[in-house]
């Protein structure tokens, strides 16, 4: 279980409604359903991952959040979760604004490209690091926007996205 799942679970209240955007194989959805008794839905771009989720009995639709969040009504969820995915969107600003429209609260986690281990790897090895949160080679990564925590804070201020907990 990823450490970030516990962080997310500690924020989400029991019996709430949740949309997991980029839900991957549904691991977080299962965790929240079991431990928080939430009514949870997912949206995932990968057809294979959607099939895995459905096989687990989870409610997931195949779609791209950059375009498909528009189909959800305003404030239709208590929480909208976007875990480790923001950097893969062409226009992260649109995605954040849609998260805030669809959910009463948004929970966003990002890989910190400024993490000291990442920087040390780059400094001493001279190559882009491969870690558990950054598992791809530079030429085969879905990440198109690399940012640090400070970059994300500045971005949030620019689009009036208030960070409550970090």
What is the meaning of each model-derived region?
Residues 27, 31-68:
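Class I SAM-dependent methyltransferase SAM/SAH-binding core
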Residues 22-24:
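Class I SAM-dependent methyltransferase "Motif I" SAM/SAH-binding loop
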Residues 68-74:
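Short conserved loop adjoining the S-adenosyl-L-methionine
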Residues 14, 75-76, 102:
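Alpha-helix C-terminal capping/helix-to-coil transition sites in glycosyltransferase folds
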Residues 1-15:
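Conserved alpha-helix/loop element of class I SAM-dependent methyltransferases that forms part
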Residues 93-101, 105-166:
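S-adenosyl-L-methionine-dependent methyltransferase catalytic module, highlighting the catalytic core
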Residues 79-91:
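A short SAM/SAH-binding and catalytic strip from SAM-dependent methyltransferases
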């Amino acid at each position: 279980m990823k450490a970030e799942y516990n962080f997310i679970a500690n924020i989400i209240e029991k019996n709430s409604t949740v949309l997991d955007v980029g839900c991957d194989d549904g691991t977080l959805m299962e965790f929240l359903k079991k431990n928080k008794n939430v009514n949870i839905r997912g949206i995932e771009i990968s057809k294979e991952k959607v099939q895995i989720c459905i096989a687990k009995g989870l409610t997931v639709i195949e779609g791209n959040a950059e375009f498909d969040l528009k189909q959800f009504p305003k404030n239709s969820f208590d929480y909208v979760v976007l875990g480790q995915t923001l950097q893969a969107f062409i226009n992260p600003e649109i995605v954040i604004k849609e998260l805030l429209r669809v959910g009463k609260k948004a929970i966003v986690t990002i890989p910190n490209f400024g993490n000291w281990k990442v920087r040390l790897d780059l400094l001493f090895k001279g190559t882009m690091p491969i870690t558990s949160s950054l598992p791809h080679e530079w030429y085969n990564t879905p990440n198109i926007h690399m940012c640090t925590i400070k970059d994300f804070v500045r971005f949030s201020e620019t689009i009036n996205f208030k960070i409550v907990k970090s």
